[in-house]
Amino acid sequence: GAFIMPGTLWCGAGNAASDYSQLGTEKDTDMCCRDHDHCENWISALEYKHGMRNYYPSTISHCDCDNQFRSCLMKLKDGTADYVGQTYFNVLKIPCFELEEGEGCVDWNFWLECTESKIMPVAKLVSAAPYQAQAETQSGEGR
């Protein structure tokens, strides 16, 4: 199956929850992931949406969702939250997107060449801002 962070049901590829209310033992971190999974504006892997094809192996989200996700995890000042944040933003470096007025394709021919485009909100990729670990180290100092 897909990789899900131990102690969570929503952190990782897909989710392992049977319904929205179900959370893992790392409840606070899991809530951040669940909220991010329910972001309104996203483009799944290889999907064409907002005038752009997502060539990443995972879903990319609107930057508002990724910024909320980062803040949610950082507020917890917790090792598990830091691990999830560092994996998503620093290791996988999953970008987010902003929408800008631009020209997007709306119709293609058999060879996948654009035959009709129009002015519409078009997705522009934004590099993931780094995640700063927030948990206290064993000596009591921040990392």
From Swiss-Prot:
Disulfide linkage: C11-C33, C32-C72, C39-C65
Active-site residues per Swiss-Prot or TrEMBL entry: H36
Family: Belongs to the phospholipase A2 family. Group III subfamily.
Superkingdom to which the source organism belongs: Eukaryota
UniProt keyword Cytoplasm present: no
One GO CC term, this protein: extracellular region
GO annotation, biological process: arachidonate secretion; lipid catabolic process; phospholipid metabolic process
SUPFAM superfamilies: Phospholipase A2, PLA2
Protein name: Phospholipase A2 isozymes PA3A/PA3B/PA5
Cofactor: binding details: Binds 1 Ca(2+) ion per subunit.
Note: The sequence of isozyme pa3b is shown.
Principal location listed in the UniProt entry: secreted
Compartment(s) where it occurs, according to its Swiss-Prot or TrEMBL record: Secreted
Tissue expression as described in the entry: Expressed by the venom gland.
